[in-house]
Amino acid sequence: MTHQTHAYHMVNPSPWPLTGALSALLMTSGLIMWFHFNSTILLMLGLTTNMLTMYQWWRDIIRESTFQGHHTPTVQKGLRYGMILFIISEVLFFTGFFWAFYHSSLAPTPELGGCWPPTGIHPLNPLEVPLLNTSVLLASGVSITWAHHSLMEGNRNHMLQALFITIALGVYFTLLQASEYYEAPFTISDGVYGSTFFVATGFHGLHVIIGSTFLIVCFFRQLKFHFTSSHHFGFEAAAWYWHFVDVVWLFLYVSIYWWGS
């Protein structure tokens, strides 16, 4: 390894940003093909490419941070700023969906019957599955905080238990959301109500799946003793992301499920 006189990590050229971008293109194109032509070939190709990219990119980052020691305190500080900016960009992303929802619901057009929910739409009961989903995500927020505190105290077993509980709650939330979609009395094509409901809650569901994947990687890394009480930014970033997903759901629940019904 060459000697360097600074604390920054000079990253080697990597193909994964390109393959990740191509997999995103294949997945979005595949979704359109699935919706309009009932063909899942392109979607499956995109998902496979995405999974391979994730595996190999994570492998490289783990190698650079844990085994080669490139993630110095200075690099970790930069990564923290990067994660904060990423979460801010996600906040703005969801702001667009809330804007669309409130724009449509606060002044419903005569075409919708001048009321919200629009005439003919039977909204979901906010005190049934949505309320259960809310309690599941709030419980997962408690368990991820327990995992973080256990890691800071060097209690490995408690950290693994709490992380496993968080992942299980995340998977349970996803299954509940899928069953709710399956049984919903309206579809994404049912006007502006269906569009705003499924796009906002669907993107949140996608973020829960991403967060769960992030936490599963952290779980396997912890099994291999990758984290210490002073060096665990991978887990910290996952915890921040999970709390963000939690807060977004609270806004979705209050706005779309409770007030919007």
UniProtKB/Swiss-Prot annotation:
For the Mitochondrial matrix compartment, the record's topological domain ranges are 1-15, 67-72, 153-155, 224-232
Q: Which GO terms describe its biological process?
A: mitochondrial electron transport, cytochrome c to oxygen; respiratory chain complex IV assembly
Per the UniProt record, one Pfam family is: COX3
* CDD domains attached to this UniProt entry: Cyt_c_Oxidase_III
Q: Which InterPro entries match?
A: Cyt_c/ubiquinol_Oxase_su3 (IPR024791), Cyt_c_oxase_su3_dom (IPR033945), Cyt_c_oxidase-like_su3 (IPR000298), Cyt_c_oxidase_su3-like_sf (IPR035973), Cyt_c_oxidase_su3_a-hlx (IPR013833)
Question: What does the record say about its membrane topology?
Answer: Multi-pass membrane protein
Name the Enzyme Commission number(s) assigned to this protein: 7.1.1.9
**Which EC class is this protein assigned?**
translocase
Q: Which UniProt keywords apply?
A: Membrane, Mitochondrion, Mitochondrion inner membrane, Translocase, Transmembrane, Transmembrane helix
Recorded GO MF terms: cytochrome-c oxidase activity
| Family under the similarity heading | Belongs to the cytochrome c oxidase subunit 3 family.
What does the function comment of this entry state?
A: Component of the cytochrome c oxidase, the last enzyme in the mitochondrial electron transport chain which drives oxidative phosphorylation. The respiratory chain contains 3 multisubunit complexes succinate dehydrogenase (complex II, CII), ubiquinol-cytochrome c oxidoreductase (cytochrome b-c1 complex, complex III, CIII) and cytochrome c oxidase (complex IV, CIV), that cooperate to transfer electrons derived from NADH and succinate to molecular oxygen, creating an electrochemical gradient over the inner membrane that drives transmembrane transport and the ATP synthase.
This protein is called Cytochrome c oxidase subunit 3
User: In which organism is this protein found?
Assistant: Aepyceros melampus
Gene encoding this polypeptide?
Answer: MT-CO3
